[in-house]
């Protein structure tokens, strides 16, 4: 709990408020049915004293929607509760406007496309037509080479009609599908797309996608996210203002709703026990503030050993990005274990996860509680093959400092002889790029994987720890323990 605006604010929806009302107070309805509080809605308890006026804007209040609360010290309060749900339900019931498909029709008719640009891939959603993922490279002579995958095309009329009919039936039965968007369950309208580029990992079955349109009044049909939910099956979330006129698809913010507990004659404006609790809390805050900065780093490392954050989400070729916080090993020990291959980096978002063991292998895998672990060898280490590769490629890249000196910026290693690729009939192979990364956290590691060509991968590993060993790289980019 914390003080704010003349009242006590709940930091967790429902919980602290109910703790105050139930732990300190005893409720009485005076013969009426007690109003219900929902755990899904955040509340803030205010103690305005004996005289105050109810708000006339925002959430609706009625004088008869209250409970009488009595504390253990016989202090009495009349707590007026907000009416938070009835308005939305009535609006949904009375709605007679266009259905969601009709609301989106202008977007499908005007042949517009939305784009999302990421570090390597660009995603193109042409509404009602197709979803494309592509990367453009300029070759010698300014020739542009395009590497692309279609993640889905508009389904045939009969299949599309079936999906629309299912969506309309769900709407009539109030079963609007929802998706967790930034912690809030948000309604969406689904549009299916199939017949995409064949997927080698699924016996050349075509890629398919579900486009999820959600209401956002200030949006311009932006692509919020692209995610591969299972192998070669994708979810694309589009923000659009067109659905916002439909009450069932409208984005609903979760404002903090005020409860006003008015003291009755003979009672203080705020319960004695609550005031004592706040005084104790204020005393505890002072040493907490003093120790906060000292403990912050160690607390993060001990309590959050593996946090993954996506910065390039979307498809099979853009495989993964992850951030890992390493436990408190000394730098020397960590470097030694990393170079020996005994400390491996693992990460990934979506269906596939990835494992990189320096000087050993790069694996791609999926774990399922029913079918077990499916693993694909992306590449294995062979020093002689790498040295041959280094003769034709840049194994050691430099950065020119302001004083004219050069430092190693990145080293690249070749891992070949992976599992045979269904598309090329050749072994998979991967180039591992190790880079120095400045970070506030000395133990932060970023791992990402790309697939610029079929079954030819790039694995990036960036960390402040690598900064300490890059300058040990020889002409072939091979690393060793620093002196």
Curated annotation (Swiss-Prot):
Isoform 1 and isoform 2 are N-glycosylated. Residues 1-33 form the signal peptide. InterPro entries: Man6P_isomerase_rcpt-bd_dom_sf, MRH_dom, OS-9-like, OS9-like_dom. Keywords: Disulfide bond, Endoplasmic reticulum, Glycoprotein, Repeat, Signal. Disulfide bonds join 113-126, 199-232, 215-244, 344-357, 421-455, 436-467. The keyword Cell inner membrane does not apply. GO terms for biological process: endoplasmic reticulum unfolded protein response; ERAD pathway; negative regulation of retrograde protein transport, ER to cytosol; retrograde protein transport, ER to cytosol. GO terms for cellular component: endoplasmic reticulum lumen; endoplasmic reticulum quality control compartment. It is found in: Endoplasmic reticulum lumen. One of its GO terms (molecular function) is unfolded protein binding. Residues 111-246, 342-469 form the MRH domain. Glycans are attached at residue 195. The keyword Endoplasmic reticulum applies. May form a complex with OS9, HSPA5, SYVN1, and SEL1L with which it interacts directly. Interacts (via PRKCSH 2 domain) with KREMEN2 (when glycosylated). Interacts with HSPA5. Probable lectin that binds selectively to improperly folded lumenal proteins. May function in endoplasmic reticulum quality control and endoplasmic reticulum-associated degradation (ERAD) of both non-glycosylated proteins and glycoproteins. This is Endoplasmic reticulum lectin 1. It comes from Homo sapiens.
